[in-house]
Design a protein with these regions (language model features):
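Positively charged n-region of N-terminal signal peptides that target proteins for export
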Residues: 1-4
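Low-complexity, Ser/Thr/Pro/Gly-rich disordered linker/stalk regions
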Residues: 20-278
């Protein structure tokens, strides 16, 4: 049995991209974001690639999509010596990731629409042993005084009431239960389009409306949408796995690779007829 000797923070996504090497990139399936980076740890393999419909890969719209694959070894530290503090690294055995980071944004009092389409590979396997897989998150920028939360919201594959679901979760709209997007087994091998319409507020005057395949599945009104005192953030898309320590301490080689496809990743302002009425 292997023993995990380093201290791991209980906060899921506290690892900030500044501790990793970030490589500029440009995917044409991402629109509206000013910056794109592959969030890549030092000396790790990039498994995020553009694939073509003409080569037989699943594509939601147009000719290409983004294939994301994560391996159990996709963890580590950035340049320098951040490994002295485990909080600054992805702890091997407890986390692995392949993500695209889309640049910091001011959020407070803004009204934004975030869209993306996700396709779970037919061979995608959900994790066991209490592990969680995040596919899409709005990370907090941690710049404001009192901003200690990792994220404003995220979408994850996790076990819920005995089965694995893709769910939306928020640390901001703190009174809300997870929003069920779909059972993982039902989402494999097909595209699911998601749209998040958000009025970013630090008090309980915000709103968060969620669409799945153009149908409203949740609408949180008069709610806090910014975590803690946080006023900014940045979207990350890809696969981020945490709490995989159960595999490390038992059968590390049984932790499977996972693959999803992403397309039509869009940030935009709402059109005049889409804006929330005051």
């Amino acid at each position: 049995m292997r023993f995990f000797l380093l201290v791991i923070t209980p906060i899921f996504f506290l690892i900030n991209g500044s501790f990793a090497d970030e490589h500029k990139t440009k995917f044409k399936d991402i629109k509206g974001y000013k910056k794109q980076f592959i969030s890549m740890h030092y000396k790790k393999t990039n498994r995020i690639i553009e694939v073509k419909k003409s080569d037989g890969f699943p594509v939601f719209e147009g000719d290409t999509s983004i294939q994301v694959t994560v391996n159990r070894e996709d963890a580590g530290c950035g340049h320098g010596n951040p490994e002295k503090l485990q909080i600054n690294c992805d702890g091997k055995g407890n986390r692995s990731r392949q993500e695209i980071s889309l640049g910091e944004m001011k959020l407070k009092n803004k009204e934004h629409i975030y869209e993306y389409a996700v396709y779970f590979d037919e061979n995608y396997e959900s994790l066991e042993k209490g592990a969680v897989v995040v596919i899409g998150q709005m990370h907090a920028d941690n710049k404001a005084k009192g901003c200690h939360n990792c994220c404003h919201f995220w979408a994850q594959d996790t076990k819920y009431k005995g089965e694995n679901y893709y769910t939306w979760v928020s640390k901001s709209a703190y009174s809300s239960d997870p929003v069920i997007i779909g059972k993982i087994d039902d989402l494999k091998g097909k595209w699911t389009h998601l749209k998040f319409h958000v009025l970013w507020k630090i008090d309980e005057t915000g709103r968060f409306k969620i669409y799945r395949n153009n149908e409203v599945i949740a609408d949180f009104k008069n709610t806090k949408t910014l975590a803690d005192t946080c006023t900014g953030g940045y979207m990350k898309f890809g696969i981020y796995r945490h709490r995989t320590i159960g595999y490390w301490n038992s059968d590390w080689e049984s932790l499977p690779d996972q693959r999803v496809y992403l397309d039509n990743i869009i940030l935009r302002k709402p059109k005049k007829d889409e804006k929330f009425k005051k």
